[in-house]
């Protein structure tokens, strides 16, 4: 049994986007928490207004939440009691390498190298096709005492920031990480489940974004709820196949970070990935959608997921179809027809 952690932790959330802000708000309701924003003007405005007007407009943040644009100050908050601290990385996949590289230089100097650390991003790094844990390992793996994991699950940041109920999974081989996240966030509105399957949790979080784009395209084409249900179910099969090839536990894909996150992202009105798909299905070009300011991790990581799957000889027909529509000029309806024309086969592989 893991050792119980104290009732109070010092928490630093690095990254003041919507998700980082939401988690910082949740943690600050029970623990001394600092939210680091790279943009000084944003940090100053958030501290003055107790609101992230850029990413979560209209959501009041707890008065106890501290906001700083000084990374050294945010980390110094932990250095007062490093044995009872937690670092949450709230940056997207694209921001992981630069932030982890900076932490590799700063944490040991402050005696924080063994502080439990979790990341919250979902996706594959575009240039390398790495999952987040591989990025963390590359940047921080040589740091003595590293205890790291991933926090994920079906969640929209706005609802979490508002204090509405949510269930999340923390996955790590380190009991210290699992315990720290549970202590920091588990409470009246947040339920935390623990796992050791980092790869499974990450694969689910990455591929569900791509499948959600496909579901949005389906809805944009007005193909009906039957078609969307088929995409969700067969998309889950793609996630499980990919995960199996990387050593993930299959039961993970039936849980919060697999089926749960997929259903939410593929059907929720707040899903950016689904919204991009809706626009594509309605006939808009990807370049125009992105130029309007709409972003989605499913677009960013689709090619990386496809390329890594090809290298591993994993069949991902829905992911391949999404890439063909987004990047190769294939019409959405032609992609649907190609998926429907695939050879009939058993739903589950024969043992």
From Swiss-Prot:
Record keywords: Cytoplasm, Lipid biosynthesis, Lipid metabolism, NAD, NADP, Nucleotide-binding, Oxidoreductase, Phospholipid biosynthesis, Phospholipid metabolism
InterPro entries in UniProt: 6-PGluconate_DH-like_C_sf, 6PGD_dom2, G3P_DH_NAD-dep, G3P_DH_NAD-dep_C, G3P_DH_NAD-dep_N, NAD(P)-bd_dom_sf
Enzyme class: oxidoreductase
UniProt: NADPH binding residues: 18-19, 38, 122, 157, 272, 297
Enzyme Commission number(s): 1.1.1.94
A Pfam family annotated for this UniProt entry: NAD_Gly3P_dh_C
Localization (cell): Cytoplasm
Active-site residues, record numbering mapped to chain: 208
Keyword Thylakoid: no
Protein name, per record: Glycerol-3-phosphate dehydrogenase [NAD(P)+]
Gene: gpsA
């Amino acid at each position: 049994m893991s050792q119980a952690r104290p009732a109070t932790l010092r928490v630093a959330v690095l990254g003041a986007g919507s998700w980082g802000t939401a988690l910082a708000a949740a943690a600050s309701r029970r623990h001394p928490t600092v939210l680091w924003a790279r943009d000084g003007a944003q940090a100053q405005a958030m501290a003055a207004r107790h609101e992230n007007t850029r990413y979560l407009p209209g959501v009041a943040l707890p008065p106890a939440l501290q906001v700083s644009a000084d990374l050294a100050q945010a980390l110094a908050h932990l250095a007062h009691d490093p044995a009872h601290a937690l670092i949450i990385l709230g940056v997207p996949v694209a921001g992981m390498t630069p932030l982890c590289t900076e932490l590799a230089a700063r944490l040991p100097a402050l005696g924080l190298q063994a502080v439990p650390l979790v990341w919250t991003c979902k996706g594959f790094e575009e240039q390398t096709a790495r999952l987040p844990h591989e990025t963390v390992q590359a940047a921080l793996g040589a740091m003595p005492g590293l205890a790291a994991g991933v926090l994920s699950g079906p969640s929209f940041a706005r609802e979490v920031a508002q204090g509405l109920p949510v269930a999340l999974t923390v996955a790590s081989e380190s009991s210290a990480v699992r315990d720290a996240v549970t202590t920091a966030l588990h409470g009246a509105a947040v339920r935390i489940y623990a796992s050791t399957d980092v790869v499974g949790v990450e694969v689910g979080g990455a591929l569900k974004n791509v499948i959600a784009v496909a579901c949005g395209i389906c809805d944009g084409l007005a193909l009906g709820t039957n078609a969307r249900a088929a995409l969700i179910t067969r998309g889950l099969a793609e996630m499980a196949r990919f995960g199996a090839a990387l050593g993930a536990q299959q039961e993970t894909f039936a849980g919060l970070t697999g089926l749960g996150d997929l259903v939410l992202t593929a059907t929720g009105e707040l899903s950016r990935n689904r919204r991009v798909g809706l626009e594509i299905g309605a006939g808009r070009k990807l370049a125009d959608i992105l130029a309007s300011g709409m972003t989605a991790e499913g677009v960013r990581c689709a090619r990386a997921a496809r390329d890594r799957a090809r290298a591993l000889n994993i069949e991902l027909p829905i992911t391949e179809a999404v890439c063909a529509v987004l990047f190769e000029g294939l019409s959405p309806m032609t992609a649907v027809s190609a998926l429907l024309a695939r050879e009939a086969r058993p739903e589950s592989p024969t043992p």
